[in-house]
């Protein structure tokens, strides 16, 4: 006979700072042992200290938990590479930074495991779309797929 499955009480999606998670209201609402979670999370993310790390926490009725660490959001990576604090207020009229195609490809390769893109080219277009919405230009890359023919 298969072992009984634990009863899930909550699934929470949080953005925490790598290596610096602390017990607080966001974690308290999940209903887990906060000290145990923060110690484990900080140990696993100490190499990403200071970066925003999305985490999905599954809390069970017996107060145990599982969690999955995701990759840093594209917007944070773009701001970090472009060395800006925020995107453009009106990205259609304003450009706040320009990054190289190689820098964008680096982000695409890093994010590929969490994206729905099938290859680097599709991931690069997704990164370009996010960059465009922030007022960041990627040299030599369009957010749109070029049509063949015509």
Swiss-Prot record:
One or more lysine residues are methylated. SMART domains: RL11. Pfam families: Ribosomal_L11, Ribosomal_L11_N. GO terms for cellular component: cytosolic large ribosomal subunit. InterPro entries: Ribosomal_uL11 (IPR000911), Ribosomal_uL11_bac-typ (IPR006519), Ribosomal_uL11_C (IPR020783), Ribosomal_uL11_C_sf (IPR036769), Ribosomal_uL11_CS (IPR020785), Ribosomal_uL11_N (IPR020784), Ribosomal_uL11_N_sf (IPR036796). CDD domains: Ribosomal_L11 (cd00349). The keyword Transcription regulation does not apply. Keywords: Methylation, Ribonucleoprotein, Ribosomal protein, RNA-binding, rRNA-binding. One of its GO terms (biological process) is translation. SUPFAM superfamilies: Ribosomal L11/L12e N-terminal domain, Ribosomal protein L11, C-terminal domain. One of its GO terms (molecular function) is structural constituent of ribosome. Coiled coil: none annotated. Gene3D superfamilies: Ribosomal protein L11, C-terminal domain, Ribosomal protein L11/L12, N-terminal domain. PROSITE patterns: RIBOSOMAL_L11 (PS00359). The keyword rRNA-binding applies. Part of the ribosomal stalk of the 50S ribosomal subunit. Interacts with L10 and the large rRNA to form the base of the stalk. L10 forms an elongated spine to which L12 dimers bind in a sequential fashion forming a multimeric L10(L12)X complex. Forms part of the ribosomal stalk which helps the ribosome interact with GTP-bound translation factors. HAMAP family: Ribosomal_uL11. Belongs to the universal ribosomal protein uL11 family. This is Large ribosomal subunit protein uL11. It comes from Ureaplasma parvum serovar 3 (strain ATCC 700970).
């Amino acid at each position: 006979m298969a072992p009984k499955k634990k009863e899930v009480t909550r699934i929470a999606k949080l953005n925490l700072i790598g290596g610096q998670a602390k017990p607080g209201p966001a974690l308290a609402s999940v209903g887990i042992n906060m000290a145990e979670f923060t110690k484990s999370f900080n140990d696993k993310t100490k190499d990403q200290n200071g970066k925003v790390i999305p985490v999905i926490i599954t809390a069970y009725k017996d107060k145990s938990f599982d969690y999955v660490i995701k990759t840093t959001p594209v917007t944070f990576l773009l701001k970090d590479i472009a060395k800006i604090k925020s995107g453009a207020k009106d990205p259609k009229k304003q450009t706040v930074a320009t990054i190289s195609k190689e820098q964008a490809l680096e982000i695409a390769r890093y994010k590929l495991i969490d994206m729905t893109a099938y290859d680097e080219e599709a991931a690069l277009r997704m990164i370009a779309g996010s960059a465009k919405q922030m007022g960041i230009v990627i040299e030599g890359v369009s957010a749109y797929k070029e049509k063949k023919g015509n």
